[in-house]
Structures are given as structure tokens and as C-alpha cells.
A protein has these predicted regions:
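Conserved "repeat-terminator" motif of extracellular CCP/Sushi domains
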Residues: 1-8, 58-118, 122-124
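Detector for intrinsically disordered, low-structure N-terminal pre-sequences
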Residues: 7, 20, 47, 116, ...
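N-terminal compositionally biased, intrinsically disordered segments and leader/signal-like regions
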Residues: 11, 18-19, 23, 34-35, ...
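Short, ordered, surface-exposed loop/turn motifs in non-cytosolic proteins
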Residues: 11-24, 128-149
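Surface-exposed intrinsically disordered loops and tails
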Residues: 24-27, 59, 81-105, 144-168
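Solvent-exposed, conformationally flexible loop/turn segments
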Residues: 24-32, 63-67, 114, 142-144
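Surface-exposed interfaces of beta-sheet-rich extracellular modules
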Residues: 31-65, 84-85, 157-170
Length: 170
């Protein structure tokens, strides 16, 4: 008898890998999904469901015409990045201190969650001499982003600010 354990992604129901084990009808299926799931978590996946482990121990059936197929479903982990925190660095653990933590993808290298816009007003007389001190104003903007740890894709949210207009200057 043969049992097939398929690991699929919720993103397009794509098969990530397949394991096959064989044995005799009535015997327990000697297999564990733990190591594969751990590896996928390191790559940035989350476990959605595990048909093989659900419901207890599995036994080879007596139907020789069909393989027993179990599906382990995984989703791509998307991690939010708060603009008020330091930006993540590529290839560093998402969860420091956890040995099996996935790592930030290279796409976070130039993550741009903060932006400033400045204006400078120069006060000068007609002859070009300084009339009074310059006025410099800066507006600060920030945005959240969501990083897909598997693909590296970054989804940026809208820019926000506490003040989006320069002060009136005379």
C-alpha cells in the first residue's frame, strides 16, 4: 500500500512537495509531518491544516486500487512592519531568539516606511541681501507595510501624517 502526503500552498493551491510512504494493509503508517512543517515554517509559511495528523494514528487501508492521500495546507506568512519600529534587516530572524524563525527577505533592504518633505523660505531684499532668518518647515509621513516572507513581496499601506499642510508664513 502507498500513502501520499502532499504539502500545498493556499496561494494557488500549488504543491510544494510530496512525500510517499509504503507499507502493508492494516499496518500503522510510520510517518510524521513535524520535520517538513518545521522546515516550511523556517521558509516563512504558516500551518493551516494537517490532514495526516488530524484524527490520530493512520493505518494503511485495504484498497490497492487507490493511494491514500493526505494534504498538509500551508499559507505564506505576511508580517506587518510598523514604521515606528526600526526597519528589519535582510536575512535576520523575524522572531529573534527563536531558532526556527523565518528570516526577513532581501526585499526589506531599502524598506521605505518614513518620508519627510521640507520647504525653506528665504527672505531677501531686492538687492539680494538677507531680510530675516530663513523659515524651514518639515512634514513627516509614515506608512505600514506588509512583507510576504516567502515571496519577498511588500504591500505598502497609505501614507499618514499628523500634519499635512505647511504653516502660513508672512
Amino acid at each position: 500500500q502507498k500513502a501520499v502526503i502532499r504539502y500545498v500552498s493556499t496561494n494557488g493551491n500549488r504543491v510544494l512537495t510530496t512525500d510517499e510512504v509504503t507499507g502493508k494493509s492494516g499496518e500503522a503508517i510510520a510517518y510524521s509531518t513535524t520535520s517538513q512543517i518545521t522546515e516550511f515554517k523556517k521558509q516563512g509559511y504558516n500551518l493551516v491544516s494537517d490532514e495526516f495528523t488530524a484524527g490520530g494514528a493512520k493505518v494503511y487501508d485495504y484498497d490497492t486500487a487507490r493511494d491514500q492521500v493526505y494534504t498538509v495546507t500551508l499559507s505564506e506568512r505576511v508580517e506587518p512592519v510598523n514604521p515606528d519600529n526600526p526597519s528589519p534587516q535582510p536575512n535576520t530572524p523575524v522572531n529573534p531568539g527563536q531558532p526556527d524563525s523565518p528570516r526577513w527577505p532581501g526585499t526589506v533592504e531599502n524598506l521605505d516606511n518614513k518620508e519627510s518633505v521640507s520647504r525653506t523660505i528665504h527672505y531677501v531684499y531686492e538687492d539680494g541681501s538677507k531680510a530675516k532668518d530663513d523659515v524651514v518647515e518639515t512634514l513627516n509621513f509614515k506608512r505600514w507595510s506588509n512583507v510576504n516572507l516567502v515571496t519577498g513581496h511588500i504591500d505598502f499601506q497609505d501614507w499618514t501624517t499628523n500634519d499635512d499642510t505647511f504653516d502660513k508664513v508672512v
